[in-house]
Amino acid sequence: LVQAKETDMHGIRGRHIGVIFQEPMTALNPVHSIGRQIGESLMLHRGMNTREARDAAIQPLQRVRIPAPEQRVDEFPHQLSGGMRQRVVIAIALACHPELIIADEPTTALDVTVQAQILSLLKDLQAEMGSSSILITHDLGVIAQSCDSVVVMYAGRVVEKAPVRELFANPRHAYTKGLLASIPQLSSMRKTKLPTIPGQVASIADFVPGCRFCQRQGVRGQ
């Protein structure tokens, strides 16, 4: 894909790979209706005209469980709540039934209740469509709830990868251990200081050979 021509990428984006962005208000175009934004990929990849794409956009809205989709399809992003806007972003990503779904922090801007609903929806849709998914997140709770395997990255490099259960039970890398240790525990004493990872992320100009986390843990990685 890195070496693919732009003309080839036009046929891949939306059709074979769908992307769900983290901030629905900025991901959606405020001057276009919901139906037009969903229909764009249908016109590009399915050869539909504007009217056909608008009518076909109702089905993705039904799939993501938006009530009254026949009405919502002609509304604009500002008329929807944050949770509904995120469902529209998901509908756009899934309109052409892609084989791979990339979800970039899909619940960051949502409250906890809506977050749980969106994660459950994504899981159901993935099973329904038989798609694979890549979830990009900093939320370890979301990872534990939604993923089968996990890749931990630090400063642009993979530092650890493992099945989710194994990673939470037996983290190997110091950065992973630091992340897990920083999760607040209900059993902790009220005035106990929360564990933190010391230091700052190094500048790209200061990276040293080996493990990029070594400057924060005091031990050079092999």
Model-identified regions with their sequence ranges:
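A short, surface-exposed alpha-helical micro-motif characterized by mixed small hydrophobic
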Residues: 143-145
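Short, glycine/charged-rich "phosphate-handling" switch motifs in NTP-dependent
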Residues: 149, 161
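ABC ATPase NBD coupling module
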Residues: 1-18, 36, 44, 50, ...
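Conserved ABC ATPase "signature" region
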Residues: 52-71, 180-181
